[in-house]
Amino acid sequence: MNVPATRKDLMIVNMGPHHPSMHGVLRLIVTLDGEDVIDCEPVLGYLHRGMEKIAENRTIIQYLPYVTRWDYLATMFTEAITVNAPEQLGNIQVPKRASYIRVIMLELSRIASHLLWLGPFMADIGAQTPFFYIFRERELLYDLFEAATGMRMMHNYFRIGGVAADLPHGWIDKCLDFCDYFLTGVVEYQKLITRNPIFLERVEGVGIIGGEEAINWGLSGPMLRASGIQWDLRKVDHYECYDEFDWQVQWQKEGDSLARYLVRISEMTESIKILQQALEGIPGGPYENLEGRRFDRESDSEWNDFDYRFISKKPSPTFELSKQELYVRVEAPKGELGIFLIGDNSVFPWRWKIRPPGFINLQILPHLVKRMKLADIMTILGSIDIIMGEVDR
């Protein structure tokens, strides 16, 4: 009886949803031939909470605390997009000081998000040390957030027409001190990581995406810029007051995991440049458009002295969304975060469609990991930078 020396059976392995490298409750059904990946199927939905449907039963002000639960590591961006949509719909002007404060908060949030990408990404590929260093810097950021907004995470700070509160006394000096300190921290990261031969062995040439391919897949953010496409919505859409600052779009042309790392590291230093200019040039004036509080009231005298109506047992400003539709987007740390809003002359949105960057960037994962080694899945998935809260919504 002849027994074959080798068997060519394919093995199907479940990675996740409770795997330390899955960055949340992501499940990958991986088909393996030995160490080689033949197929990979992501299974989503474990963190689905019906965020779009909830929006249709809440006013914008009531909905604001919910949106910080999409991408819970960069909550300022979800708040920004939530107030930008009704501001554009109602043509509400944001005071210059409020716009500067928003930019400061957005860039601090971008740094915090990139830091918490960097640590776990390095841990995924076997480097534990940076994981502890990033929390040192991130703690300083969260102290700044807590001083300005009262919350370390889930800040609920943005409002239609401005922000919830002005910056406290001494906060700007404290933030400038952080900027000076953090620049030395980024140099330290680059010394520790960028030329490390073991790190380069793991990431160089792994998960290559060409420029045209990135556009065809609808990628955005560092995923797109690492493939040679100089596309940043802060330059393209001119929202808030980014045009008033001197900064450059960071990009690389290689399109591999190393390029995505380099883009994010460079973006942190650019964010510091924007922060320093904004903090030194912040104008005086109101932090909120008080005209925006004088919402359209019914002619009924019963409402003449009230800015609030009771809707589903919660007081909420009577800001009616006019019957039109628009798409609003911001450059979040992970890519293009967008909202498609349809108003219906009601205080509730008729449709609130979320365009999450993580969900769309994740679609290319099966294409990238095919014919790679099993260990490369961690590197490629880590370089995409996903948060399951916004992927599943």
Curated annotation (Swiss-Prot):
GO terms for molecular function: NAD binding; oxidoreductase activity, acting on NAD(P)H, quinone or similar compound as acceptor; quinone binding. NDH shuttles electrons from NAD(P)H:plastoquinone, via FMN and iron-sulfur (Fe-S) centers, to quinones in the photosynthetic chain and possibly in a chloroplast respiratory chain. The immediate electron acceptor for the enzyme in this species is believed to be plastoquinone. Couples the redox reaction to proton translocation, and thus conserves the redox energy in a proton gradient. Its EC number is 7.1.1.-. The keyword NADP applies. Pfam families: Complex1_49kDa. It is found in: Plastid, Chloroplast thylakoid membrane. Keywords: Chloroplast, Membrane, NAD, NADP, Plastid, Plastoquinone, Quinone, Thylakoid, Translocase, Transport. It catalyses: a plastoquinone + NADH + (n+1) H(+)(in) = a plastoquinol + NAD(+) + n H(+)(out); a plastoquinone + NADPH + (n+1) H(+)(in) = a plastoquinol + NADP(+) + n H(+)(out). This is NAD(P)H-quinone oxidoreductase subunit H, chloroplastic. NDH is composed of at least 16 different subunits, 5 of which are encoded in the nucleus. GO terms for biological process: photosynthesis, light reaction. GO terms for cellular component: chloroplast thylakoid membrane. The keyword Lipid metabolism does not apply. It is a peripheral membrane protein. Belongs to the complex I 49 kDa subunit family.
